[in-house]
Amino acid sequence: SNFNTSNVTSMQSMFEGCSNLIELDLNSFNTSKVSNMSYMFYKCKSLKMLNISGFDTINLNNMSRMFWYCSSLISLDLSNFDTSNVTTMERTFADCSSLVSLNLTNLITNKVVDMSYMFNSCKSLISIDISGFNTSNVTNMEGMFGFCQKIVTLSLTNFNTSKVTKMANMFQECVSLIDLNLTSFDTSNVVDMRGMFQNCKSLTTINLLNFDTSNVTNMWRMFLNCSSLKELDLSNFTTSKVTNMESMFHACVSMTELDLSNFTTAESNLKGMFMYCEKIEILNIRNFDFQNVNNYENIFKQIKSNVKIIVKDNTQKNWLNTNFSNLTNIVVAD
């Protein structure tokens, strides 16, 4: 209570590694001049009760990894935080694996640039209310919700993603996610979508018809093991800059129809792209050019021999017949 923090400007790593700390009451702290709270409670693995309700965060600009690995923390209320000057929230709550309640009601995020891995591995969270988030300046959302294994529905209709360049692993391992509305997403500046929906095992449908992928270079494992998806229309996808599609639909075991009619494949890695898509009946790849593909190893492994594969011309048909003699239903597009 006699600890005077009125002139402190940085509390970076202040309690880092205090792994035996169970309760911490910092309500009396004067934090009005603090600009940096990054790593402040990093690896406080036993911390169950944290009182920071009196924090004045008007000058705070860095919350990066602030609560990272507070793996015993069950509840966290930041509704009193003024985050109007914060620019980075990278890994702020990452690996808070016991967190059940997270109140971010009044968070102001209009200056935040980096939200990568922000909630990654919050494995006990059932829902996150981020309806008030302003993401108009965010450029990095990589891994943002990855491994949030209990979240069933996620509404991101308020998200402005016009400046985002990285969405890799954004929803990776969201194994309980059933409903995901991304119809408002502007992806025109996104470069990296690798692993974006990897292991979203419960997703039965997803609408990506508004996605602009004209600048994307990496789609590695983008839908890997989306084992409940039955149909996927990606006919709007532009893949002229994509060089890696390896395992993109690997183990989409319920998929029956896949429309990739606008996909081009010049100098791409297609290794294992459709591997274990065991139920697929129609595969529209009418703009694929296999002659320029870098790697096609196991591309059709464990798919039905009579799957209808639509290609653009006889050159592609003959190439497939030569290299995959087990495929019996290759047709040239009308």
Annotated model-derived regions:
Residues 297-300, 316-329:
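Short, aromatic/basic amphipathic alpha-helical patches
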Residues 1-9, 20-35, 45-61, 71-87, ...:
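Structural signature of tandem-repeat unit edges
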Residues 13-17, 39-43, 65-69, 90-95, ...:
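Short beta-strand elements of solenoid repeat domains
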